[in-house]
């Protein structure tokens, strides 16, 4: 999803093709990708985690400029599985990551009614401080807020929307002096304590959300004092520039 599309060197093309084939090779015959690594241990149902993994793989494959027959078949199977499979049986999804990725998928693959409904759900879940939690039941954090900003902007919500401006304010006020964002763990015994991996992901998505939602004119006129540049998504224990 983040590859440099201007790089058409033969070596790069071969690497992208190899990665494409690797991802397709991991797809289940039913159309989904099973979550791996640390993802199955996250504080949400594994069915929801599998859906998020599937949506991210699908969106990554969808960026390829010249999809081949094998990729098209993989894509269509994934879309069909996502549409026909609820995240948690009869229960709604619990993570903002599911709602945001589902919105991006709906926008990408032409589901106007779903786009509107998902966008409304995300906007309604915004907390009073302007942010979203990675888990919607938890406090706001950079991870959930960056995801929401990215998805809302991708779905067509303008940067002038009050919800976007409030989210910017939340991220500006919670960024550390080092340029990163602190995201706490969600499970005992790490709950309410800095979690290194979550902070890495949170800082990355905060940067992606800001980049996606900010207009070029705003980016050019923003000063370091009003919109501190993210120096690195590497976790820092620095203090926030201001309290929300």
Q: Where do the protein language model's features map onto the residues?
A:
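An alpha-helical repeat/solenoid feature that recognizes helix-turn-helix modules
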Residues: 1-21, 29-75, 84-120, 128-169, ...
């Amino acid at each position: 999803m983040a590859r440099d599309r201007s790089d058409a060197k033969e070596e790069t093309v071969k690497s992208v093709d190899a990665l494409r084939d690797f991802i397709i090779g991991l797809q289940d015959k039913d159309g989904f990708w099973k979550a791996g690594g640390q993802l199955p241990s996250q504080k949400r149902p594994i069915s929801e985690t599998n859906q998020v993994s599937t949506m991210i793989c699908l969106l990554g494959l969808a960026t390829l400029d010249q999809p081949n027959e094998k990729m098209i078949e993989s894509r269509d199977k994934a879309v069909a599985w996502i549409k026909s499979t609820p995240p948690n049986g009869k229960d709604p999804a619990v993570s903002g990551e599911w709602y945001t990725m589902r919105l991006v998928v709906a926008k990408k693959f032409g589901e106007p009614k779903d786009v509107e409904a998902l966008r409304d759900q995300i906007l309604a879940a915004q907390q009073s401080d302007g942010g979203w939690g990675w888990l919607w039941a938890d406090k706001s954090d950079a991870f959930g807020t960056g995801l929401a900003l990215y998805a809302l902007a991708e779905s067509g919500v303008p940067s002038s929307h009050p919800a976007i401006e409030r989210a910017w304010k939340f991220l500006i006020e919670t960024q550390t002096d080092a340029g990163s964002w602190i995201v706490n763990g969600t499970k005992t015994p790490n709950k309410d304590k800095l979690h290194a991996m979550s902070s890495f992901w949170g800082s990355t998505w905060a940067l992606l959300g800001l980049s996606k939602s900010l207009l070029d004119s705003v980016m050019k006129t923003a000063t370091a004092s009003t919109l501190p540049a993210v120096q690195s998504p590497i976790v820092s224990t620095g203090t926030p520039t201001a309290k929300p």
